[in-house]
């Protein structure tokens, strides 16, 4: 049958490229009989879109009803034809919304329909009339069967069905259907949106759907239209806003399209400027306070001494750089008139001042004792009387004592009353030697006088003992020869 229809001998090869070239050569031919390459291999297993097969769609009944609804030819002319005349390629011959598609492929599908009709026994005139009738069918009815044929953009069906279901396909222009969701070429700022009165006017091209879209989406007016680039430039965020403009322009337009109202409040340039000024003042004040605090702390930390109110320290502060010698000596004197005690550490001076004031902050917590002391070493010495601890041992005889002065007196006995370690009235050990004594000056003088008297008495006794020993030795030497 194919040989009878195609009245041309096979001149091309059987490769797909050769068949494609032959098909392209035949496009635009108005003859009802189209010559296509044919060979034994092509007739057996090749792909031929215009060749009738047993599995081709038979849409006679649907086409008959379709013709009646659109006012075309009678249903008998279409229903009486074979299934090849009603193939799917005849329906999609042309489309009013796609002129390029119609001009390029309209003749191809018309010729193929005429060839199939001739093969089925239908006259070429009737087949041509059928193709002409089908090409004049309005696209809105054909879109129900083949919605993707003749679309100007892949999102056109969603665009028409989502916003206005009554829009015809011919009313939607290519510019209006393909530009409203695109990213703007030059957005002003990352929060710059359309004016409240226009809605989507700047994001839609001029076309028929604008009136209906404005009527539907005009109520969704953005509340942050006054938040422009100047508000952020006053606060020093202009560069970051400009850098983020190309990232957020699409999302904010889609936010307005979907009907979500923004949550950002409106700000004016004056309020933003006031807030920026307040923030800068607060930051500068905090920085100045931090700098002042750090300088004061560093001055106290690296001054080499703690804060002291003794007369020597006050004099050094008054003299300034001239008082460096006083600060270098590190002498802290008691300010009580008539005392004149001088200490090398402020802690010793504070302990001494507690003796003047009578303050006794250290309390013995032994059962039924409750005695109070001026210094902590005094309390420790008192606690050893309760516990019986003897922490001072003699290095010669290993005898132990409770007080350090007792040990000092004992060591003198080993040295024959002279030299050796000089004892102190304090019972502090080597770890607490820096703690000053808190006895009164009278007691200290009394102790020193007693010690001197004892030393003098001991020296006199030693001299007397030596004289007695010398006299006894002389007598023995004088009587020795007489005894013999």
UniProtKB/Swiss-Prot annotation:
Compartmental location: Nucleus
Spans annotated as Disordered: 409-446
Keywords from the UniProt entry: DNA-binding, Metal-binding, Nucleus, Phosphoprotein, Repeat, Transcription, Transcription regulation, Zinc, Zinc-finger
Motif mapping: 9aaTAD: 178-186
One cellular component term from this protein's GO annotations in UniProt: chromatin
Molecular function GO terms recorded: DNA-binding transcription factor activity, RNA polymerase II-specific; RNA polymerase II cis-regulatory region sequence-specific DNA binding; sequence-specific double-stranded DNA binding; zinc ion binding
Zinc fingers (C2H2-type), renumbered ranges: 332-356, 362-386, 392-414
PROSITE patterns, per database record: ZINC_FINGER_C2H2_1, ZINC_FINGER_C2H2_2
Major subcellular location class: nucleus
Example of a GO biological process term: regulation of transcription by RNA polymerase II
Top-level taxon of origin: Eukaryota
UniProt signal peptide: none
Similarity remark: Belongs to the Sp1 C2H2-type zinc-finger protein family.
UniProt remark on domains: The 9aaTAD motif is a transactivation domain present in a large number of yeast and animal transcription factors. In SP9, the motif is inactive.
Protein name: Transcription factor Sp9
Organism the protein comes from: Homo sapiens (Human)
Gene: SP9
């Amino acid at each position: 049958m194919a040989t009878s229809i195609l009245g041309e001998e096979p001149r091309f090869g059987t490769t797909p490229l050769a068949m494609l070239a032959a098909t392209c050569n035949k496009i635009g031919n108005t003859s009802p009989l189209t010559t296509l390459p044919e060979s034994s291999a092509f007739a057996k297993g090749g792909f031929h879109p215009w060749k009738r097969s047993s599995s081709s769609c038979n849409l006679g009944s649907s086409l008959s009803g379709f013709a009646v609804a659109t006012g075309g030819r009678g249903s008998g002319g279409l229903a009486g034809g074979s299934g090849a005349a009603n193939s799917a390629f005849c329906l999609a011959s042309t489309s009013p919304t796609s002129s390029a598609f119609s001009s390029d492929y309209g003749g191809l599908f018309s010729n193929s329909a005429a060839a199939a009709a001739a093969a089925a026994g239908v006259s070429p005139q009737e087949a041509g009339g059928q193709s002409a009738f089908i090409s004049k069918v309005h696209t809105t009815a054909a879109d129900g069967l083949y919605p993707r044929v003749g679309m100007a953009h892949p999102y056109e069906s969603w665009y028409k069905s989502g916003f206005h279901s009554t829009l015809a396909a011919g009313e939607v222009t290519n510019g209006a259907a393909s530009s409203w969701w695109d990213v703007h070429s030059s957005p002003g700022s990352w929060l710059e949106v359309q004016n409240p009165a226009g809605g989507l006017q700047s994001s839609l091209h001029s076309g028929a759907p604008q009136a209906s879209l404005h009527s539907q989406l005009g109520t969704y007016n953005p509340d942050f239209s006054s938040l422009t680039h100047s508000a952020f430039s006053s606060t020093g965020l202009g560069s970051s806003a400009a850098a983020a403009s190309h990232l957020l322009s699409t999302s904010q337009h889609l936010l307005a399209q979907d009907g979500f109202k923004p949550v950002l409040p409106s700000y004016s340039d004056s309020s933003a400027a006031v807030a920026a000024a307040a923030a800068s003042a607060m930051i500068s004040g905090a920085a100045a306070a931090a700098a002042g605090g750090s300088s004061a702390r560093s001055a106290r930390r690296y001054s080499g001494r703690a804060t002291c109110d003794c007369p020597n320290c006050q004099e050094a502060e008054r003299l300034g750089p001239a008082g460096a010698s006083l600060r270098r000596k590190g002498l802290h004197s008691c300010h009580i008139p008539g005392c004149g005690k001088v200490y090398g550490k402020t802690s010793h001076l504070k302990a001494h001042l507690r003796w003047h004031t009578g303050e006794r902050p250290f309390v013995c917590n032994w059962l039924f004792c409750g005695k109070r002391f001026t210094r902590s070493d005094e309390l420790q010495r008192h606690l050893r009387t309760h516990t019986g601890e003897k922490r001072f041992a003699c290095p010669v005889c290993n005898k132990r004592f409770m007080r350090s002065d007792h040990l000092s007196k004992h060591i003198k006995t080993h040295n024959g009353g002279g030299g050796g370690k000089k004892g102190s009235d304090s019972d502090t050990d080597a770890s607490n030697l820096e703690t000053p004594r808190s006895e009164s000056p009278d007691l200290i003088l009394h102790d020193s006088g007693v010690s001197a008297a004892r030393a003098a008495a001991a020296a006199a006794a030693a001299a007397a003992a030596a004289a007695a020993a010398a006299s006894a030795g002389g007598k023995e030497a004088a009587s020795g020869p007489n005894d013999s």
